[in-house]
Amino acid sequence: MSTGHSKAAKEFLKNQTYAKWHDATFWSVRTKRDNMAYGLEEWEQLREKASAIKRHTITHLDEYLDQFATNAEKNGCIVHWAKDAKEFNHIVYTILKEHNVKKMVKSKSMLTEECEMNPFLESKGIEVVETDLGERIIQLKGQKPSHIVMPAIHLNHDDVGELFEEKGISTEKGNHDPTYLTYRARLSLRNEFLTADAGMTGGNFGIASTGDIVVCTNEGNADMSTSCPKLHIAAIGLEKVIPNYDCLAVFQRMLCRAGTGQPTTTYTSHFRKARPTAEPMHIILVDNGRSEWIGNPEHWEALKCIRCGSCMNTCPVYRRSGGYSYSYFIPGPIGINLGMLRDVQKHSGNVSACTLCLSCQTVCPVKVNLGDQIYQWRQQLDDFGTANPQKKLMCKGMSMVYGSQGIYNLGTALAHWANLIPSPLMNCGLNPWAEGHKMMEFPKKPFHKLIKDLEK
């Protein structure tokens, strides 16, 4: 009954020392989140408010998108609409080509990961430099993010130190001190900022009432990406638009507390228009399936997500299997749901990567019903033609047993004879349960028989 996720998780767990470190690291972030939440008496009210704002905005998205675009254009920005990833990449390339851009620096953006923008631009001869430290590390390593907020969390300081030595960023061989490595990365990135022809940012929020793009970072790289080059391109998904600054105040109090256990991000950057001496600012609003997802009655609330990553930090499966065990580029509970919205045939294997503990729903700052949605996806696998045939057979057998009182009574009466089966026969490859579990010992008397005996 293996899935792509379970097979990848098995590889992840081969290094038990690393697996335990990974689990403990993310649980510590979850603990920091809890401490921050407990420090605000109004935390649950904020969650309710944030959820209500998102529900309202998404169900009136056409109005707010029109308002945002109108105000952005009044500010002097050039607004583009991209229906899918292909059109988005084409728009970005066209803008860069018109300005003879050879190198572009960019701050963190999961949207560009979604649209696979970097490899597209590189195939056109344009160098793209990630400026978020974690993103830069995995870019140099040729990897994808393993977490949406902490993309290089799966690497330790020795991994990074060796990488920096290989790339010529670090000059002191064997010096893997994090402070030193950060210093060397800063020097390297400073040169990239100063020699770039264009800068790109994503956006945590788009403010409809003003046309502003708001970017939250801890490193200030979004500011550097827009202050040094003369051309600024901002790209956001349609769902990132919110009504006004009063709404932003709610999300600003929650985003970082939920994601990393900090009171707020170090930098909150507001972009309304280009600098006086710069080229006009370009804003790209990307659909790429979102308008279709809004029409899904059971799963549209996944669009409320503000990409804080708290569902991953708390998820017992993500913590013990890693981000690369998932087939979708966003891992964890939110990634399971978004992946299924994207392509049920490709990502159905992820829905088993959930214990239905609902911890993700407990911590989500905008109250996305992540676990409930995963449960709903599981009920639909047979309709999609992606249900596991072994599980289907097992469920039919269980239905037969529990649907017949006689068969059930016979099974419970004879169950203890299974204790006599030699262990090598039970704990073999033909019994998936034996991997990671010990077979239970069946009592001689089933529970209902014990109760009847007590009642005599």
Language-model segment annotations:
Residues 1-298:
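The feature marks the mature, well-folded catalytic cores of soluble enzymes
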Residues 1, 5-25, 39, 394-456:
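Intrinsic disorder at enzyme termini
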Residues 308-312, 357:
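Extended amphipathic alpha-helical segments enriched in small hydrophobics
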